[in-house]
Amino acid sequence: MASVEEIRNAQRAKGPATILAIGTATPDHCVYQSDYADYYFRVTKSEHMTALKKKFNRICDKSMIKKRYIHLTEEMLEEHPNIGAYMAPSLNIRQEIITAEVPKLGKEAALKALKEWGQPKSKITHLVFCTTSGVEMPGADYKLANLLGLEPSVRRVMLYHQGCYAGGTVLRTAKDLAENNAGARVLVVCSEITVVTFRGPSEDALDSLVGQALFGDGSAAVIVGSDPDISIERPLFQLVSAAQTFIPNSAGAIAGNLREVGLTFHLWPNVPTLISENIEKCLTQAFDPLGISDWNSLFWIAHPGGPAILDAVEAKLNLDKKKLEATRHVLSEYGNMSSACVLFILDEMRKKSLKGERATTGEGLDWGVLFGFGPGLTIETVVLHSIPMVTN
C-alpha cells in the first residue's frame, strides 16, 4: 500500500508551470479617445456641464490612450438611461447585461487560446475565471464551462471583484494548480466589461471621471501546464515564482463599492507614488534568489493602471524607456482592461519578439517580471522565464 508521501509525490508535476497558449478578444464597439469627451457628455445628457467637459477632455488627452473597446453602446444607454446617470439605481439592469456578456466575451478569448494550444478541450482539467464585472451563482466559470463544452468534471475556481491586480492572481493560482496536479492543464480566463462602472459625470467625483477616461473592455485567456509535451505543445513563458503583498495604510487608495448605482470607483491622487515607492522591495524579494538586481536586464509586463503610474515606476527604477513599450502599447490600443491587461501584454511581447526575430519570447532576454496593481493597495509579482524561439 502506498504511503501518504508517495501519493503526494505522485500527484505533483516535475517541472515549473508554463504558459502554453494565449488568446485575446474585445467587443466590436470601438471608441476613440480624441473625441470621447464629446461622446461621453452627449450620451450621458451632460453637455451643459461645459467646464467639467473641458477638464475631462484634458484627462483624456493625458491618458496616452488612442482607443478602447466598450460593450455599452449609445442605443443601450437610450434604452436604460439610469446607467448613464451619475447616481441612479441601475444595478439590476447592469447585472442582467454583465452576467450574460462576460462569459461570452471570455469564450472568444478561450477559443483562440484553445486553437493555438491545439489539443482537445477534454484535456482541460481546471478552469480559473476572473472578472470584476457582476456576481451570481452559479458563476461565470460555470457558464463558460458550458459555453465551451468543457468536461463536467473540470475543477473550477471563480474569482470575483479582485480588480486590476488580478492578472497576477490568476497566474499565481494556475501555477499552484499546475505544479501540484501532475498532467493538469489549466484554462485561465479574465473577462472585463465596464457596464458595471459606467456612469455620468459629477463635479464632486473626479476620481470617477478618471475611471471613465481609462477603462476599456476585453478578455484574455491562457493555458497553463507543467511538463509540456514538446512534440505537441509550444511553451511560451515559465512561471518561476509568484507573490502577493499589500502596502500598509493604503486601504482606500484604490477602491470599488458595489451599490444600487453599480460599482463606484475611488482613487487617491498619490497612487503612483505609493506604487513606485514600494515596487523595488517586491522586485528585490523576488529576484534576490536569482542574483538579479539590474532591473533593466529584465523584460517587463506591468499592469498599465495609467500613464502616471508607469511614469513613476519608470523614474523610480531608472528603467530604459523601451522596457515598458509593450505595456504602453496595450494601454494605447485598449485602455485599462483591469485583470485582462497583463495577459494582453504577454501576448504583445511574444508577438513582438517573434516579429523582431528575438532569441527568446521575452524580447531576447531570459528573465522577466509581471506586475499587477490594484485595490488593497495590492501588488502581485510574478517571475517569468522566457523560452528560446528555436523551441517555439
Swiss-Prot record:
It is an enzyme of class 2 (transferase). The active site is at C164. GO terms for biological process: biosynthetic process; defense response. Keywords: Acyltransferase, Cytoplasm, Plant defense, Stress response, Transferase. Substrate binds at K55, F56, N57, R58, L267, G305, G306, P307. Coiled coil: none annotated. One of its GO terms (molecular function) is trihydroxystilbene synthase activity. Induction: By stress. GO terms for cellular component: cytoplasm. It catalyses: 4-coumaroyl-CoA + 3 malonyl-CoA + 3 H(+) = trans-resveratrol + 4 CO2 + 4 CoA. PANTHER family: CHALCONE SYNTHASE, HYDROXYMETHYLGLUTARYL-COA SYNTHASE. Mediates resistance to pathogens which are sensitive to stilbenes. Homodimer. Belongs to the thiolase-like superfamily. Chalcone/stilbene synthases family. This is Stilbene synthase 2.
